[in-house]
C-alpha cells in the first residue's frame, strides 16, 4: 500500500500542480460553464460554475482517453471539492455517488494502455479489442448513470439529458463505424497519436492560460504539487486496508475455490468452459488493477495474445475499473 501510494505521489504532484495552474488561469471554470447544461442536471447539488464541475469533466475526459495516471489526481481533486459542498462530512453526498459510479464504470474511448500491453505480448492486431471495449464501457456507463438517476430521483426525461444520451449514442455509433472502416494498424496508430497529442495540448493550454492571466506559474504549480503530496500521504491507510483484504482473498485459496466451483457447474450444465480461464482477471479487476493486469498478461503469455482467453482478459481489463480500490482511494482522500 505504501509503495503504491509512493508511486502515485509523483503523478499526483504533477497533475494537481497542472490543475492548480488551470484553476487560477480560468480553464477549469471555462470547462464548468461548458458542461453546465448537462452536469447541472446530473449533479443538481453542485452550484453553477463551481470548480468541481470542471474537475469532474477533466477526470472523465482522462478516463475516456485511457489515461489512468492522469485521471486519478483529477478525480481526487474533484472529490475534495465535492466534500467542501457536502453538508454531512461523514457521509457521501449524491454528487459524490454519481461521480464515483460514472468513474467506476470505466468509460474508455481510446484504450491506450490495453493496446500497448497487447502489442508488447505479440498480438498481430493490438487494436482488435477496440470496438468491444468501447461498446462494453459505454453500456456500463449508461447503466450506471440511469441507475443512479433512478435512485436519486433525477428526471432523465429532461431535454438536456435526452440530448446528452442521444448525442452519446450517436457519437459512439459514428466512432465505431469510422474505426470499423479502418485497418487495425491505423486504429492503433491514430487513437494513440490522438490521445498523446490531446494530453500534451492540455498541459500546454493550462500553462498558457496561466501566463495570459499573469500569474506566477511556477509558484502555482508548486502549490498544487504540495496538495498532491499531502493527498498521497492521506490515502496510505485506506490503501493498506483494501490491499490486505485482497491479499487474504488470494492467499486463502478462496478465489481458486470459487473458480473451481464455477468450472464444475458450467461443465455439469454441458456448456463451454473456455471462458472460465478468464475468471481470475474478472474477479481480481474490481479489487486490484495491478493484480488483474498481472493475470491478464499471464493469460496472454499462456494462451497467446490473439487467443479467445487473451482477448477476453484484455476486454475485461480495459472495460471495467478497480471499484473497491477507487472507493478506498477517493473516499480515503476526503476522510
Task: For each feature predicted by the language model, list its residue ranges.
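Interfacial loop-to-helix junctions that mark the boundaries of transmembrane helices
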Residues: 1-3, 126-132, 156-162, 185-198, ...
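Membrane-embedded alpha-helical segments and adjacent helix-loop junctions characteristic
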Residues: 1-84, 213-302
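Alpha-helical transmembrane segments of integral membrane proteins, especially early/N-terminal helices
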Residues: 21-32, 94-97, 159-168, 199-202, ...
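Membrane-core helix-loop-helix motifs of multi-pass transport proteins
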Residues: 82-172, 306-317, 323-335
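Transmembrane helix-loop junctions in multi-pass membrane proteins
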Residues: 23-28, 109-125, 150-152, 176-190, ...
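A cytosolic-side transmembrane-helix exit/cap motif
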Residues: 148-150, 179-187, 240-243, 275-280
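Short hydrophobic/aromatic segments of transmembrane alpha-helices and their interfaces
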Residues: 53, 90-93, 200-201, 275-276, ...
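Hydrophobic mid-bilayer segments of alpha-helices in multi-pass membrane transport proteins
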Residues: 9-14, 163-172, 193-209, 236-244
Amino acid at each position: 500500500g505504501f509503495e503504491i501510494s509512493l508511486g502515485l505521489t509523483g503523478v499526483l504532484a504533477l497533475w494537481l500542480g497542472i490543475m492548480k495552474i488551470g484553476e487560477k488561469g480560468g480553464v477549469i471554470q471555462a470547462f464548468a460553464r461548458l458542461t453546465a447544461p448537462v452536469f447541472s442536471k446530473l449533479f443538481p447539488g453542485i452550484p453553477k460554475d463551481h470548480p468541481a464541475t470542471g474537475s469532474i469533466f477533466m477526470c472523465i475526459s482522462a478516463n475516456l482517453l485511457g489515461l489512468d495516471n492522469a485521471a486519478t489526481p483529477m478525480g481526487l481533486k474533484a472529490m475534495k471539492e465535492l466534500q467542501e459542498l457536502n453538508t454531512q462530512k461523514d457521509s457521501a453526498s449524491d454528487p459524490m455517488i454519481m461521480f464515483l459510479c460514472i468513474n467506476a464504470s470505466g468509460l474508455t474511448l481510446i484504450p491506450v494502455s490495453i493496446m500497448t500491453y497487447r502489442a508488447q505480448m505479440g498480438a498481430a492486431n493490438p487494436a482488435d479489442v477496440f470496438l468491444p471495449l468501447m461498446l462494453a464501457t459505454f453500456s456500463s456507463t449508461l447503466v450506471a448513470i440511469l441507475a443512479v438517476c433512478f435512485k436519486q430521483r433525477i428526471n432523465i426525461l429532461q431535454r438536456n439529458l435526452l440530448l446528452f444520451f442521444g448525442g452519446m449514442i450517436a457519437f459512439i455509433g459514428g466512432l465505431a463505424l469510422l474505426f470499423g472502416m479502418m485497418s487495425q494498424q491505423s486504429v492503433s496508430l491514430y487513437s494513440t497519436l490522438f490521445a498523446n497529442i490531446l494530453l500534451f495540448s492540455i498541459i500546454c493550454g493550462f500553462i498558457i492560460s496561466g501566463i495570459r492571466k499573469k500569474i506566477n506559474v511556477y509558484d502555482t504549480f508548486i502549490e498544487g504539487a504540495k496538495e498532491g503530496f499531502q493527498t498521497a500521504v492521506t490515502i496510505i491507510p485506506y490503501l493498506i486496508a483494501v490491499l490486505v483484504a485482497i491479499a487474504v482473498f488470494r492467499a486463502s485459496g478462496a478465489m481458486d475455490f470459487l473458480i473451481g466451483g464455477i468450472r464444475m457447474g458450467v461443465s455439469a450444465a454441458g456448456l463451454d468452459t473456455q471462458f472460465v480461464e478468464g475468471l481470475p482477471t474478472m474477479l481480481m479487476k474490481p479489487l486490484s488493477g495491478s493484480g488483474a493486469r498481472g493475470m491478464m498478461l499471464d493469460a496472454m503469455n499462456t494462451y497467446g495474445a490473439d487467443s479467445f482467453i487473451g482477448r477476453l482478459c484484455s476486454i475485461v481489463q480495459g472495460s471495467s475499473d478497480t471499484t473497491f480500490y477507487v472507493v478506498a482511494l477517493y473516499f480515503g482522500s476526503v476522510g
